[in-house]
Amino acid sequence: MALNLSPEQGVKLTKKDRVHVAKKIKQGWKATCLIPDYGFDENGDIQVMSDRNRRTVKIVKIKDDGIYIEKALKSKNLRILWGKISLVSPTKEIKDGLKIDMYDGKYVVFSIYNSYKIQQITQYIFNYINDKRTNNEAMYS
């Protein structure tokens, strides 16, 4: 599956860039996120408070078991397991953003803070997430 974000002509990620991006994927990136408006009810259970997603700036990490958005729920991390992701696609909600659709109908959008080769890095992250998701589906099917 290919994604064309129409990157600048002739600008490519070098081997050094790819190594740096791979390292940053694990460490985490500061990103503008649109996440479901989760909150806690009186019993302490997680509930969706409204249908609209809220915009926030968080650290996004992509680990072996899923995507983590740090402190998305007060002090708790939001973890999106590979098995819960139904589709990854580019979006116009946030400039150079990626939309992660889940099987339960919710979605998360994020765009990393980086002005240097942003479209190529977003393309790399898109491919990385898709590979992880597909490998996870193949492993459990």
Put a short name on every predicted segment.
Residues M49-G97:
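Phosphoinositide-binding peripheral membrane targeting modules
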Residues C33, D41-N43, E70, F110, ...:
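Short acidic, gly/pro-rich beta-turn/loop elements at beta-sheet edges
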Residues K26, L34-P36, M49, V60-K63, ...:
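A structural detector for beta-sheet-dominated domains
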Residues L3-S6, G10-V11, H20, K76-S141:
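Acidic, Ser/Thr- and proline-rich intrinsically disordered linker/docking segments
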Residues M1-V60:
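Anionic N-terminal interaction surfaces
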Residues K16, P36, F40-G44, S50, ...:
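Intrinsic disorder/low-complexity signal
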